């Protein structure tokens, strides 16, 4: 299934039905009074969050959505039937913006939330409302209200507890596959991950959700590579796991490249708790591991953890540390 996280669609409420002009007709009664019924209310447009969805692909090929119109009023004071409301399901994490993207209208952060974005138009009044002492047979009625129509921008930000970051080929997808049941595409070339991947990590009787986004490169926040499009998907997480390729000739430069992109993208990412991991330690000697860890710790003033997703060295420790960090922020 295609991963779609940005769409623009046009939505419209149902118009109200028109009021009816009608007069009571019965045998032996020549001039019955007005009995025109009211028009039915138009249907509303409602968005609902649905945990079974993880993409906005349903809105990629269809852009226009309209609720049902209310029926016109009828004789014998019968009101028209109200139009059915239109319910549009979106993934948890979807944000609804104005067409220009500047005004946030709603943010779905939990399952089964509802948001009525457009109300249906009111039904018109039948002629029975306009009978007066001087006008016993009014032919007046009102038309139903025309419902609002608008273009909106839907943006999906995945909800996860932990975000995986690093340069391409830092081993993020392998890490995800080792600690979860997720099956991301893995190969030894850059940009294997083309879309965000989510997985659930189980630790004893507890669990958390981890997100792997495409690798970052220098200039990602300006649109280079793939990362900038997906950085928003880790804005909501509690902690970042920053993987660094231990086989790199310059681990400090690799670290700084990713940090610059995070800090340039938003303060949300800049200030998140970071767990730094030196990955691929299985291909390094003990002396090389210690040398690179010392270099990183001296520059960052943070603890750096040696791991290997190939041998599982240190992976379980990182998972438990991530869970502890998440719980400390709750």
Curated annotation (Swiss-Prot):
Cofactor(s) named in the record: Mg(2+)
UniProt: GTP binding residues: 166-173, 191-195, 212-215, 279-282, 308-310
Residue ranges occupied by any Obg domain in the UniProt entry: 1-159
InterPro entries given in the database record: G_OBG, GTP-bd, GTP-bd_Obg/CgtA, GTP1-OBG_CS, GTP1_OBG_dom, GTP1_OBG_dom_sf, OBG_GTPase, P-loop_NTPase
Bridged cysteine pairs (disulfide): none
Subcellular location: Cytoplasm
Domain OBG-type G: residue ranges: 160-327
Similarity remark: Belongs to the TRAFAC class OBG-HflX-like GTPase superfamily. OBG GTPase family.
Cited function: An essential GTPase which binds GTP, GDP and possibly (p)ppGpp with moderate affinity, with high nucleotide exchange rates and a fairly low GTP hydrolysis rate. Plays a role in control of the cell cycle, stress response, ribosome biogenesis and in those bacteria that undergo differentiation, in morphogenesis control.
Protein name, as recorded: GTPase Obg
Source species of the chain: Rickettsia felis (strain ATCC VR-1525 / URRWXCal2) (Rickettsia azadi)
């Amino acid at each position: 299934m295609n991963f779609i996280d940005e769409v623009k669609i046009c939505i419209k409420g149902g118009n109200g039905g028109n009021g009816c002009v009608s007069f009571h007709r019965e045998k032996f009664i020549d001039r019955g009074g007005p009995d025109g019924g009211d028009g039915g209310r138009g249907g509303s447009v409602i968005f609902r969050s649905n945990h079974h969805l993880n993409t906005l692909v349903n809105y990629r090929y269809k852009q226009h959505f309209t609720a049902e119109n209310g029926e016109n009023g009828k004789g014998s004071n019968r009101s028209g039937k109200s139009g059915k409301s239109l319910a549009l399901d979106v993934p948890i994490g979807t944000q609804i913006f104005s067409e220009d993207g500047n005004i946030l209208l709603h943010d779905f952060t939990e399952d089964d939330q509802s948001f009525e974005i457009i109300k249906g138009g009111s039904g018109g009044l039948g002629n029975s409302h306009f009978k007066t002492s001087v006008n016993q047979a009014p032919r007046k009625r009102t038309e139903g209200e025309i419902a609002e129509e608008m273009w909106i921008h839907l943006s999906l930000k995945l909800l996860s507890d932990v975000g995986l970051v690093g340069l391409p080929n830092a081993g993020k997808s392998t890490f995800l596959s080792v600690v979860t049941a997720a099956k991301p595409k893995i190969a030894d070339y850059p940009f294997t991950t083309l879309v965000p991947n989510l997985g659930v990590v189980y630790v004893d009787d507890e669990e958390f959700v981890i997100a792997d986004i495409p690798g970052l490169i220098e200039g990602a926040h300006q649109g280079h590579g793939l990362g900038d499009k997906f950085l928003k998907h880790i804005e909501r997480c509690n902690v970042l796991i920053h993987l660094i390729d231990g086989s790199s000739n310059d681990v400090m430069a690799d670290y700084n490249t990713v940090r610059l992109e995070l800090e340039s993208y938003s303060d949300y990412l800049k200030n998140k708790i970071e767990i730094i991991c030196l990955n691929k330690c299985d291909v390094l000697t003990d002396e090389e591991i210690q040398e690179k860890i010392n270099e990183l710790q001296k520059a960052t003033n943070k603890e750096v953890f040696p791991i290997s997703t190939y041998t599982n060295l240190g992976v379980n420790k990182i998972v438990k540390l991530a869970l502890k960090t998440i719980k400390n922020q709750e």
